[in-house]
Amino acid sequence: MTKSAADSSKSFILTRRNCGQYLGKNMEIPINCRSISAETFFNKSVIRSVVFPYEMEQIGSKAFQGCSRLSEIELPEYLGRLGTGAFSDCVSLKKVEIPSGLTNIPKSAFNNDRKLSDLKFSSDSHLVSIGPSAFSECTSLTEVIFPESLEEIDDRAFYKCKKLNKVSFPEGLKIISKQAFYFCGLNSLELSDSLEVLDESAFFKCCNLTHVVIPPNVRYIGKWVFHGCNRLKYLEIRHDPDFIGEWIINKAATIRCYKGSRIDRYCQETGFKVEYLS
């Protein structure tokens, strides 16, 4: 290990100016370090693993971006803030567990971590939102079980996670934003009854989906939401959302709805095939 342990009892912040003495292949951040500032270890390809102190509270923007050989981290239990792109382009990182104190995963936090195959959340997670492109192009992810506290999955959060074939959504989830699961490998989809917004292209080109049921509280269905899902046979909508965008499915698919409903009229106007529910 490189230099570790506290040099004094006084807490301090690691920056680009004072990080040199701790930089090494297997890093152990001092126990009295409470924060790592932006870009502190940016593009430091020498780093293979990092041990953070339990009580560290903040990791800044791009703090470890581009650490191409970093394969092992254990995020601190007391972490309350993670900066934009903190671990993006860490192409060797294999495993991440999101600690309980983190309420938001910011933009591009783990973007392009191509070997990330194991993503877990603390059993007592307080996570509310996953930010834009947070896990985009994490091409080794196969399964994600989201925590019960989660309410929003933002734009492109899991964009082009091509091997992601299984997700489990919590009952409190309200928003799935634009291109959130664009071009993912999902084999099936069970959306939460709490869901209110399915935004534009949310599941665009998820080519393994065959049958999807829209939950009753969804009030907004954005355009192209299931467009490009070439194996999709049926989209079932049993209620009338406030808004329905254009080309929500391919022409080859069929929408199942009630005769005379707003969805029925939408199908007549757009030329989509319809099958009536009884």
List the predicted regions and their residue ranges.
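Structural signature of tandem-repeat unit edges
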Residues: M1-I13, G20-S35, S45-Q58, S68-R81, ...
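A short alpha-helix capping/helix-coil boundary motif
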Residues: T15-C19, F64, A86, F110, ...
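Consensus positions within tandem repeat domains that build extended binding/scaffold surfaces
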Residues: S37-T40, G60-A63, G83-A86, P106-A109, ...
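Residue-level signal for alpha-helix termini/capping positions
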Residues: F41-F42, I249
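A structural signal for leucine-rich repeat
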Residues: N111, S123-S125, S136, Y159, ...
